[in-house]
Design a protein with these regions (language model features):
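Nucleotide-sugar donor phosphate/pyrophosphate-binding loop at the beta->alpha transition
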Residues: 63-67, 102-105, 112-135, 148
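Short alpha-helical donor nucleotide-sugar binding micro-motif in glycosyltransferases
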Residues: 73, 253-254, 260-263, 269-276, ...
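Short hydrophobic beta-strand element within catalytic cores of glycosyltransferases
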Residues: 34, 310-314
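Conserved acidic donor-binding segment of nucleotide-sugar-dependent glycosyltransferases
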Residues: 326-338, 346-350
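A conserved mid-protein helix/loop that constitutes part of the nucleotide-sugar donor-binding site
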Residues: 13-21, 193, 197-216, 230-237
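N-terminal strand-loop element at the rim of the active site
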Residues: 5-64, 149, 229-230
Length: 391
């Protein structure tokens, strides 16, 4: 089966990293088109042997990109066109229809109750999205919560399929040696209780709540923020105002191509000067906190659970969709500093001697998600197909 993936950009981000990981587990002949910003993840996908094209789109209204995209689809003779993220879903669905491809799948990676990919959910955004959605066959939601939001928007229920994000579970297994190396690399005190926050440093992630909570806790509590974004300068200023100098580490992006390296490539035996990868950073932490009140899935928290970390969340559909008995290690916490401070204080006094991933993370093994996605492709692709039994 030949599949073209169209995505808005390929800089470092959750949807972009998820696409790269999924491509490594799909038994398809795949090509990728980035409308713009074919950055770090594009290079990583190409290194995996996948053909990547940068369409060079100059902006949301660069209509000249549309005929170029149509030509690519026609020349590739694809069985399925799969679009990712708002702009790519709109242009990709239109281009596929113009190229004569009706088997179009779109994944909705980041739809909240009040925003989509950081943009406010105005009537215009919704109308444009729904107009494009009608040109496709199936819209994939990364969680039941996103599926419910799509249906409330007006997407017919029969056109929505839930395929959760996935991770390579074993790559996130807790590693004591990696923990020691990473804590030394970050200059963390030996007895520090390290609280992590992973994600884009944007206002919606509410990492300010985590800093204000840390300011209420003893001096041995250190915050490690993994990611970058427009709120970083303000978060640095806030940390200084709160008297947290020396107790907050801004480590920048941890590019997922390190933990999602090629088979056989070891990322944890690398030179000590190399920046730690995400599994190493998670091993160095004692708890993971997500004060964001609105998430589409909560992939970073699943990765934290896979590392055996206790996680606190204000919103995490990935965890909320599980039975209570399967949520071991994950606890809901309202998105305010007092609540997070109280919850972290309780965790600080109860650090387990050993860390094991709860069984729940197996629900989000990437191979299972890839099998489910193949069944979506089979339902829309022309010709005889074989249903895949999820692993």
């Amino acid at each position: 089966m030949k599949v073209l993936h169209i995505i808005t950009g390929l800089g470092v981000g959750g949807a972009e990293q998820q696409l790269r990981l999924m491509l490594r587990h799909l038994p398809t002949d795949s090509d990728v088109v980035a409308l713009t910003n074919a950055g770090t993840v594009a290079q990583a996908i190409a290194a995996d042997g996948i053909r990547v094209t940068d369409l060079g789109m100059s902006g949301n209204r660069d209509l000249a990109a549309l005929p170029r995209l149509v030509r690519i689809i026609r020349a590739g003779r694809y069985d399925v066109v799969h679009t990712h993220l708002y702009r790519a879903c709109l242009y990709g669905r239109i281009a596929a229809r113009m190229a004569g491809v009706r088997a179009v799948v779109a994944t909705e990676h980041s739809l909240g109750d009040s925003q989509m990919e950081g943009r406010p959910l105005t009537a215009g955004v919704r109308a444009l999205y729904l107009a494009g959605e009608r040109l496709g066959r199936v819209t994939v939601a990364v969680s039941p919560a996103v599926g419910a939001r799509l249906h409330r928007w007006g997407v017919p229920r029969q056109r929505i399929r839930v395929v959760p994000n996935g991770i390579e579970v074993e790559r996130f297994r807790f590693d004591p040696a990696s923990r020691a190396r990473t804590r030394q690399h970050l200059g963390l005190p030996s007895g520090a209780f390290v609280v992590g926050g992973v994600g884009r440093l944007t206002a919606g992630k509410r990492f300010d709540v985590l800093l204000r909570a840390a300011a209420q806790l003893p001096a041995d509590v250190v915050v490690v923020l993994v990611g970058n974004g427009p709120e970083e300068p303000e978060l640095r200023r806030l940390a200084h105002r709160l008297g947290l100098d020396g107790r907050v580490r801004f480590v920048g992006e941890s590019t997922h191509e390190a933990p999602y390296a090629s088979p056989g490539e070891s990322t944890r035996e690398s030179d000590a000067a190399r920046a730690p990868d995400l599994p190493s950073l998670l091993s160095a932490m004692d708890a993971l906190a997500s004060p964001s009140p609105e998430e589409a899935f909560g992939l970073a928290l699943v990765e934290g659970l896979a590392s055996g970390l206790p996680v606190l969340y204000a919103s995490c559909p990935a965890v909320e969709g599980l039975d209570a008995a399967e949520r071991s290690g994950a606890a809901y916490c309202p998105s305010d500093p007092d609540s997070f401070a109280q919850a972290l204080h309780g965790l600080r006094g109860d650090v387990p001697p050993h860390r094991e991933a709860p069984a729940a993370v197996r629900h989000y093994c990437i191979s299972r998600s890839a099998d489910q996605l193949m069944n979506v492709y089979a339902s829309v692709a022309p010709g005889p197909t074989l249903e895949v039994t999820p692993r």
